[in-house]
C-alpha cells in the first residue's frame, strides 16, 4: 500500500479493516475466555 489508488473507495477500505478488526477481537476474546474458564 505504497501508492493509494484513487479508484478505490475509502469507505470500502474502512469497512474491510473494521471487519478484520472485529474478527481479531472475537478470536482474542475466545482465547482469553478459554484461558479464564479452564
Curated annotation (Swiss-Prot):
Pfam families: PsbL. It comes from the Bacteria. One of its GO terms (biological process) is photosynthesis. The keyword Ribosomal protein does not apply. GO terms for cellular component: photosystem II reaction center; plasma membrane-derived thylakoid membrane. It is a single-pass membrane protein. The chain crosses the membrane at residues 17-37. Keywords: Membrane, Photosynthesis, Photosystem II, Reaction center, Thylakoid, Transmembrane, Transmembrane helix. The keyword Transmembrane applies. PSII is composed of 1 copy each of membrane proteins PsbA, PsbB, PsbC, PsbD, PsbE, PsbF, PsbH, PsbI, PsbJ, PsbK, PsbL, PsbM, PsbT, PsbX, PsbY, PsbZ, Psb30/Ycf12, peripheral proteins PsbO, CyanoQ (PsbQ), PsbU, PsbV and a large number of cofactors. It forms dimeric complexes. Belongs to the PsbL family. This is Photosystem II reaction center protein L. It comes from Acaryochloris marina (strain MBIC 11017).
Amino acid at each position: 500500500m505504497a501508492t493509494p489508488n484513487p479508484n478505490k473507495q475509502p469507505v470500502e477500505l474502512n469497512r474491510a479493516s473494521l471487519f478484520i478488526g472485529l474478527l481479531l477481537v472475537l478470536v482474542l476474546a475466545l482465547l482469553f475466555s478459554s484461558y479464564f474458564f479452564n
